[in-house]
A protein has these predicted regions:
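Extended glycan-interaction surfaces of carbohydrate-active proteins
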Residues: 1-90, 121-145
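Non-catalytic C-terminal accessory modules of carbohydrate-active enzymes
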Residues: 51-55, 66, 78-84, 95-213
Length: 213
C-alpha cells in the first residue's frame, strides 16, 4: 500500500513504524481517485483499506500512535483513539466511499456510508450524545470517551457526505455536457429516487435496480 509521507526523518506511515501509524487511509483513497494505482497493485491497496475498517467506521490511521513521535507531530501526541490518532474519522471515510464508487464497489461504499450517517446502528445518539441530524468529523475510540463525537458542527464530513450520496452512490454528476447518471447501488436496494436542481431545472430521478434480488 501507499505510505503517508516523506520527511527529513524518513518515511512516515509504513509497516516499519513500530510506534503506530503503519497505514493511513487517505493515501490509499486518493491514489485510487487520482488513477495512479497500477492494476497489479490495486488488490493490495483495497485489501489494506478494507483491513482498516471496523464496525464503527474507518480510522485515519491504524494502529494509533502509542506515544509522541516527532516525525509525525501533533496527532501522535493525542491519546490513542482520539481524533486523527486512530479515531473513527468520518471525513476520511468519505474519501474512501468515493474511491469505492469509482471502482463500483457498491456494498463497501454503502456499508461505510451507513456508518457515517448520524444516529445509525453503530453510532446511536444516546451513545454519541450528539444531535441525530448532524454529521460529525469523528468518533473517539479511547476507552474513556468511546464513541463520543469530535467537531460535529464544523466538519467537511457534511459536504462530503452529500457528495458521497448524490455523486458517488446515486451517480448524479455534473459535466459540461450535461448531467451524467451512473449509479453504484447495492443489490439490496430495489429502488430509490432523488431530486436535483440542475441548470435551473428541477429533476426527479427514479432508479430501479435490475440487479436486485
Amino acid at each position: 500500500y501507499y505510505v503517508r509521507a516523506f520527511s527529513k526523518y524518513g518515511v512516515v506511515g509504513d509497516r516499519s513504524d513500530e510506534n503506530g501509524g503503519k497505514i493511513y487511509v487517505n493515501p490509499q483513497s486518493w491514489a485510487i481517485l487520482a488513477d495512479i494505482v497500477p492494476a497489479e497493485r490495486l488488490a493490495s491497496v483495497l485489501g489494506a483499506i478494507d483491513g482498516m475498517e471496523t464496525k464503527e467506521g474507518i480510522p485515519l490511521c491504524s494502529p494509533p500512535y502509542a506515544a509522541y513521535d516527532e516525525r509525525v507531530g501533533r496527532m501522535s501526541g493525542m491519546l490513542p483513539g482520539v481524533y486523527e490518532n486512530g479515531g473513527i474519522y468520518n471525513h476520511a471515510g468519505c474519501f474512501k466511499i468515493m474511491a469505492d464508487c469509482k471502482l463500483h464497489r457498491a456494498e463497501q461504499a454503502v456499508g461505510t456510508f451507513l456508518k457515517i450517517l448520524p444516529d445509525g446502528e453503530s453510532n446511536p445518539s444516546r451513545l454519541t450524545t450528539t444531535e441525530p441530524y448532524v454529521f460529525t468529523n469523528c468518533y473517539l475510540k479511547h476507552p474513556s470517551v468511546d464513541m463520543q463525537v469530535g467537531f460535529s458542527w464544523q466538519t467537511g464530513t457534511s459536504a462530503w457526505g452529500l457528495k458521497c450520496y448524490y455523486e458517488g452512490i446515486l451517480g448524479l454528476r455534473r459535466t459540461y455536457e450535461g448531467l451524467k447518471i451512473e449509479p453504484v447501488l447495492p443489490d439490496s436496494w430495489k429502488s430509490v429516487s432523488a431530486e436535483r436542481v440542475y441548470r435551473g431545472n428541477r429533476l426527479v430521478i427514479r432508479y430501479r435496480n435490475e440487479q436486485s434480488g
